[in-house]
Regions:
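Domain-level signature for soluble enzymes in the chorismate/prephenate branch of the shikimate pathway
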Residues: 1-206
Length: 206
């Protein structure tokens, strides 16, 4: 049996739809259900940020999670497939009236993605002071807490509604199929068989 960690919400539903397309039947978590067993799989319904942790530590053999989370956590896992779900960008946002000035010696940035932010600014050879927030990140430049933010952008509406604009894209992100390294070698045939089936559906729906 393969254990699959899925992030609560839309990505989990879309991934389970792929399993339904492959194996038939209905794949759904009922109500507040956190574990579901079906067709030789055990599905775990966990928080998005926790998926790669479950996979890295072997509590799940495989998982589905955004590339932004994988990049931020810098975990030792195997990336198998871009599932083309939940497409978005990680971007720098600033107030509409501001411009991003890379000549400044230091920029203060509010974000929950500390590693992505530090690494990006290091590549630009610009000092960065990171203020870690867990929500309502768009508020930070408006109240003088930060010069800019680094956040997930899908349509850009949330930034626009709060008087911000995208100054620069850092990376594209979408949901990826990942695997625990030990599981991949111990259950290689099982995992690769599932990988091929999922890949076929992703390419067909692409």
């Amino acid at each position: 049996m393969l254990t699959v960690a899925l992030p609560k919400g839309r990505i989990a539903e879309q991934t389970l739809d792929i399993f339904a397309e492959i194996f038939g039947g209905e794949f759904r978590f009922e109500g507040r259900e956190l574990i579901m067993e079906k067709e030789g799989f055990c599905f775990l319904n966990v928080r998005n940020q926790d998926v790669p942790t479950y996979v890295e530590h072997g509590a799940a053999d495989i998982g589905v999670v955004g590339l932004d989370v994988i990049t931020e956590k810098e975990l030792d896992i195997i990336q198998l497939l871009d599932m083309q779900l939940g497409k978005c960008k990680v971007a720098i946002g600033i107030k509409n009236e501001d411009e991003l000035d890379w000549s400044r010696p230091n920029i203060k940035v509010a974000t929950k993605m500390v590693n992505i932010t530090k690494n990006y600014f290091a590549k630009k050879a610009v000092g960065v002071e990171v203020v870690k927030l867990y929500g309502s990140i768009e508020l930070a430049p408006l109240v003088g807490l930060a010069d800019a933010i680094v956040d997930i952008v899908e349509t850009g509406n949330t930034m626009r509604e709060n008087g911000l604009k995208v100054a620069e894209d850092i990376m594209d992100s979408s949901a990826h199929l990942i695997a625990n390294k030990n599981s991949f070698y111990a259950k290689k045939e099982e995992i690769l068989s599932l990988y091929e089936k999922i890949k076929a559906v992703v390419e067909k729906n692409g």
